[in-house]
Amino acid sequence: RDTEASRGLGDVYKRQRSAVMKKVEAIIRPFKLEDVKLALVNAGIVGMTVSEVRGFGRQKGQVERYRGSEFTVEFLQKLKIEVVIDDSRVDTVVNSIAEAAKTGEIGDGKIFISPVDTVVRIRTGDRDGAAL
C-alpha cells in the first residue's frame, strides 16, 4: 500500500543503503600515532578518535623476558584511529594512513572502511555532512 508514511520509510532505507559517509578505522602501532595524525591533518581531517586496543593477527603475539623468565604476550598493544568522512575523501584518507603507518614489518596494522548512515552532532542537532 503506497502511503506517505511508507514512502518516507523507503526514503530512509534508500538513504541508508547509499550512505555518502564512511567510517575509516585504522589499527596501527602506537609509535606511529604522531606520523598518522600529521598525515591526516595534512589531508584536511579536523577530528579523529584514538583508542588504546589490544589484539593479534598474523603476528600472534611475541615472547618477552622479565627477570630472566620468558613469557608470551598474546595480545599486542595497538591504537585504533577512527574518522568519519565524506565518501569522496576515502581514498585520500586511506592512502595517508597507510603511508604514515607503514614500517614494512608484520604487525603494521589494518584499515577498515564501513558505511555510516547518519551522524548527529549532540550540541546542535546538526546531521550528516553538517555534523562532520
What is the role of each PLM region?
Residues 17-132:
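Positively charged, small/polar-rich N-terminal and surface patches that mediate targeting and assembly
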Residues 1-16:
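Single conserved hydrophobic/aromatic residue that forms the stacking wall/gate
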